[in-house]
Every structure is written in C-alpha cells, then in structure tokens.
C-alpha cells in the first residue's frame, strides 16, 4: 500500500495492514509465542511474538498519550519521557517489560483495543488536523500515526511470515 496522504487513506492503511497482521497472528500456536526467536528491535537481540505485540501496543499507546497531552495543552516528551529518538531500542525493551506478564491472548486484545482507539482518534479529526498542519516538528499528526501503526503492522506481519517460514509453520 502507498503511504497515506489523507485521512481516508490513513484509515484504509491501518485497517488493511492490521487485518493482514491479525491473520498471521491467528495461526500461531500459543506455546510458541514466548520463545525469543524473532530478530529484535535492537541489533543482535531476539524477541518473542509476545514482545512484538507488546511493541505494537506500546507505540499505539504512545500515540494516544501524545494526542491526549497535546489536547490538554501539556508538553509532550517525544518519543517518551526518559527516552530520546536515538534510544528507540531501549524504548522497545521498555515495552517488552511493560507487557511481559500478559499472555498472547491478552496482548492481542490490547492490540485490538489500542488500534480501535487510534481509529476513533482519526475519525474525530478533520483532514486538515491530520495532514495539513505540522503537529510535531515538521511531522503531521497523520504521519506520526502512520509511522506508529500501519507501517509497524506491515513490518510485524513480514517478520512473522519470515519466522513462520523458518519454523515451517503455515
């Protein structure tokens, strides 16, 4: 799919990539979801399927947090309080830790809920708010949402497919 350029394309990209991701997730045996075999978000590290979902939930929740704080006129620490943009590997580790007690089913429910909340957020905004004004630095809100939802959903789907192929799973 092309990079979204407006509200309608953003919703379609999220829905499309999320659907493809959930199809891949639905065929994974639960007993394999905690094994750290996928290439991690930091060089020379590995993560589990559960870690990958935690990463997606973590970034989705950050998008919602950023929007909430901005909506209240509060300062937002991008990407997250205590982390700089050059420390995204550490932030990924934080997400894994934040959700380490959640099982595969719970993580999937959290991802469903987070994605639903983001789609509701998008629906509540006019296209001008999403794509016609800078929201963070030079980035629009729509671009920030896309970078933390539809693009990572596609990346996660591709990682899972590669992992399934290596492990001879369908």
Walk through the language-model features, giving the residues of each.
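Amphipathic, soluble alpha-helical interaction motifs
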Residues: 20, 24-27, 31, 62, ...
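A non-catalytic, amphipathic alpha-helix used as a structural packing/dimerization or gating element
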Residues: 13-20, 106-117
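Alpha-helical bundle segments that constitute or directly flank the non-heme di-iron/ferroxidase center
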Residues: 6-34, 54-65, 151-154
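Helix-driven interaction modules
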Residues: 105, 124-128
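Short, contiguous alpha-helical
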Residues: 37-86, 128-170
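Short, helix-capping/interhelical loops that line the mouth of catalytic, cofactor-
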Residues: 1-12, 62-110, 167-170
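Short amphipathic alpha-helical interaction segments
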Residues: 99, 103-110, 114, 136-137, ...
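Amphipathic, heptad-repeat alpha-helices with coiled-coil/zipper character that mediate oligomerization
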Residues: 76-77, 116-118
